[in-house]
Amino acid sequence: RQRQMCIRDRACVAAASGMGAISSALWTIAGAGKHIVADGTLYGCTFALLNHGMSRYGVEVSFVDTSDLAAVKAALKENTCAVYLETPANPNLKIADIAAVAEIAHGYNPAIKVVCDNTFASPALQNPLALGADVVVHSATKYLNGHGDVIAGFVVGKADFIGEVRMFGLKDMTGAVMDPFAAYLILRGLKTLEIRMERHCANAKAIAEYLDKHPAVEKVYYPGLKDHVGHDIAARQMKDFGGMLSFEVKGGRAAG
């Protein structure tokens, strides 16, 4: 159980933060003259890295809606090296069809790496590599640790690529090496990952259903609700719908 994430996904390397993991993976894949297709709905620091950081070093990034497969296909170029997505996405729980995105990207160029941030789902609910993704990144600060006392991240994928991340992206480019005590705490947390995720999912579903009927709530974003635009895809590629949700209040910011 302690190593279920790595066993399922072949190999992984630990980092000192989620952004350390993401940055290490992307710097291993991309460089000057390369192109990345990324979803426009991302964790804020990931968006900043792609939109402001990598462009300083000659990496072109095109932001698209990865739930729109035609948009993904149209954005691919000869120099595209990666397609980056989160599913479920932060903060609106948007769902992308991992298998379909991977089929499009690899059909265009087998060398393109499909990178999936699996933080909101965790390995207990979703295995992107089994769906066709090449690389999976996690912020272990959240579900994988589960106790709120660690900042950490993981990059997961084929052993040869993870070796490159370890020696170049992590060691040389970011230096975001996990400390031993953080590793110990995460191993502790992984023991209860599956049972914690069961409770997270049950709680989120109950809250989402309550908010969905609340007179002051305009819209609830939770893939477990049948009217969520990504419900059917989430039901197909996830074991359950996750523990995260967001919502809008009627009247917008002024009402909140």
Describe every region a protein language model picked out.
Residues 1, 124, 178-179, 251-253:
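General structural signal for secondary-structure boundaries
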Residues 2-7:
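Short, small-residue-biased leader/transition segments that mark boundaries at the very start
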Residues 12-216, 221, 227, 232:
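Conserved PLP-enzyme active-site core in the AAT-like
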Residues 217-256:
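Conserved C-terminal alpha-helix-loop-beta "cap" of PLP-dependent enzymes
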